[in-house]
Amino acid sequence: MKALTGIKVIDFSKWLPGHYCGMVLGDFGADVIKVETPAGDDTRRFFPEALPGMSYWHLALNRNKRGITADIKTEGGRKLLLRLLSEADVFLEGFRPGYLARYGLDYATVREINPQLVYCSITGFGQTGSYRHKPAHDLNVIGLAGLNSLDDVGSACAVSYTHLTL
């Protein structure tokens, strides 16, 4: 038996941080349900494709997950997601602050149907502050922090760091 056996995770994340988090939770035995929009997850279309419509990135980061499609812009899609969340232990989401509130899927609303739910919002700059609505990925944050200026291969004091390799 794995450490997270019996834990149900709803993964409605976007991009690497959320996909990776859900993957690790699944590796530890959690029942992870990946929710995709009707258009499918953007990572499906990354190059190179392992299979038609499935990139290596998508396959690697979504191992140990079951998948469903839900359109939160429709009442049926919202009801489906709320039903899943009512029975879940963890909710992973990776949208800008306030986006899910438009659809009644924000923390305050979801907490009413499942007070025990761990609601994990993954954003580039957090929920508060002047940058909260800005999109960000690793490269943006590294640049803003000034790390790129230290990554001079010819310099004796260059900083070495490794990007994620799957």
Regions found by a protein language model. Name each.
Residues 1-164:
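N-terminal helix-loop segment corresponding to the beta1-alpha1 unit
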